[in-house]
Amino acid sequence: MGLSRRDCIKRAAAAALWGCVAAPLAAQAQTARPVVLIVGDSLSAEYGLKRGSGWVALLEKKLGAEKMEASVVNASISGDTTAGGRSRLPALLAQHKPDVVVIELGGNDALRGLPLDMTERNLAEMVRASKAAGAEVLLLGMQVPPNYGRAYSDDFASLFASVAKDQGAALVPFLLEGVANVANAAELFQPDRIHPRESAQPLMLANVWPVLERLLK
């Protein structure tokens, strides 16, 4: 049975409407940029630094220079611990839907002498939650002075590799490689000897970039 003139008009209008809706959706899908979510503490939150000079800000500039389309969300909070990051993460995952989650936490746990098994559990859960949300994960390792004994500091340094291996995350073994373990380290830190100066930020990015770049390709 043939279509009436009214039916033809309705179908033509519906097709035109769908075309108006589908075209922007297709364009949006083509231009969607990967999202990199940074969940860290003061080392990633520009503590004591001029705004825009931290390693995360330098990462954004690096992505632009490399013509890599990606958005960076810096959800770092000075003083945060792995427990704090773990509690904040679900909402961040839901809000930003990241493609890569970079976890830079644990240093404040160790400076407070918190139980290492708790730190390890928190990091592992953060990796699992991020992967369950469909994101790749990059864990940034940290080391601390032996304030609580050599065994504590050694075990702390090794737990990042353990979590990365067990949970299938990428790893930068030591974020402050070439900063904290060099002869001129004092020149690269602020007077508190905990937070790196602006001059150290490119070195930190240089440690992160090769691993992160692979995750974004």
Describe each model-derived feature in a short phrase.
Residues 28-78, 88-97:
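Serine-esterase "nucleophile elbow" of acetyl-processing enzymes
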Residues 20-26:
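C-terminal segment of classical bacterial N-terminal signal peptides
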Residues 48, 73-82, 111-114, 193:
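Acidic/histidine-rich helix-loop elements
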Residues 1-17:
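N-terminal secretory signal peptides and thylakoid transit peptides that target proteins
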Residues 8-11, 32, 40-41, 199:
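Membrane-interface segments of envelope glycosyltransferases acting on lipid-linked substrates or membrane lipids
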